[in-house]
Amino acid sequence: MEGLPQMKSTLSISGNTFIALLFSIIVLFPLCANASDKPVVEIAVRKGDTLTGICKKHLTDPHQWREIAHLNRIKNPDFISPSQKLLFPVHLLKGTPIDGTVTFIKGNVTVQEEAGKEWRALLLHNRVKQGSVLRTEEEGTVEITFEDGASFLLKPSTSLKMTTVEKKSSGYFLRELYLRSGKTISNLREATGKGSRFEIQTPSAIAATRGTAFRVSVDDSEATRSEVLNGTIGVEAMNQTVSVNKGEGTFVRKGEPPLEPRKLLPPPAVMNVLPVYKSIPLYFHFEKVADAVSYRVMFAKDSEGKDIIREQAIKPGDSFAIYTAGDGTYFLQARSIDNLGLEGIPAEPAVIRIRMNPMPPLIESPVDNASYTPQSLMFRWLRVNDAVRYHVQIAEDKEFRKIVEAGTDIRDVEYKAAGLDFKTYYFRISSVAKDNYQGDWSDVLRFTIAPPSPVPPDIRK
């Protein structure tokens, strides 16, 4: 492909569930394999089968039957038992290209189906073919899903080529992706019981695992961080390999072996989440986690964290703020970060419900901090479109603990208070929607009922 360097690295995944977060350079291998190992599948021998016949059916090049015979230690290719299960390297099997489907997209995402062709905008439900190059811009995100349920999510500012995406003759799925830059989260589910392999290649390293969920990142100094959420991975650097189990992470500086794995930090719990938030901005605080130097906080529209509205790393004790969000349900999640930059175990997202509508009316009269002599006073406000009625309160204190008058079912845009004493009062109003949801209160208005000034004597008498 034009503009892409030669591929030198591989990320291999096989199993029920896999999640990987990669930057451009990573070094990971399966515990039971070397970097040069090739995945294999088992093919059962049936009565009447011969080795050459099986190879003709399953291999791209049937003449490579000798390699199969050598791998399975078969001396006589004409004599194989129906009870045997033969190992076949996946890369030798026939394959049919399969398309991916765009199942989530946000922002500007483009695709180039072949080298030299024009880039075009990618849309929801588009099919993406083998050999395509995907590119997300600064605010772009896209998810590609395959027929077996496997998927990958490209984060903003990412470039990736779908080098090989095939379904092999044995039912084995092979996916080889080339991650040129950025981040990807991959999810592999084995729904059919058949094997599958998911490889992500980067410019200068190799990563591999089997049946696991993990994150990997590389910073500007090319240091690698690996965090395992489920299963076990092997991390190799400088000819040394460490086993990283569920709930552990390791750190690799460029040119050095991996550090001994350490436990990942638990997530910080969000404090004092309200059932409903009626106004913004929102400020969230988190409980402190021992040994955490910062927290990564994500505010998203979905529980999986694909459609992220805001993401930020904050220091312990700082607040996480949301300045813009409409009515709806959102999901807040945070992870602890230790002194090596390893991100901890994810928490279940907290459900955040925002409902600001109907908004409180704009009060026309009386005027704030004004004095009035009549003991009957008319209150007027502007109509709110999605309000069917209004709730007003008049109190002797600004905390509204001493309410002297209230109206809960006011259909008009005015309210008359009669018989008020000569003192200072406080007024507020809220809108009520058709579903009886009461919105937030208006700002408190202060007014005073004062006795009329005495009539001066008529000096003419």
Labelled PLM ranges:
Residues 294-307, 387-405:
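Extracellular low-complexity, O-glycosylation-prone stalks/linkers
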Residues 282-291, 377-387:
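Conserved aromatic anchor
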Residues 81-85, 90-280, 456-460:
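Flexible, surface-exposed loop/linker segments and immediately adjacent secondary-structure boundaries
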Residues 36-37, 57-97:
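Extracellular LysM carbohydrate-binding repeats and other cell-envelope/extracellular binding modules
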Residues 35-59:
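Primarily a LysM-type cell-wall glycan-binding module
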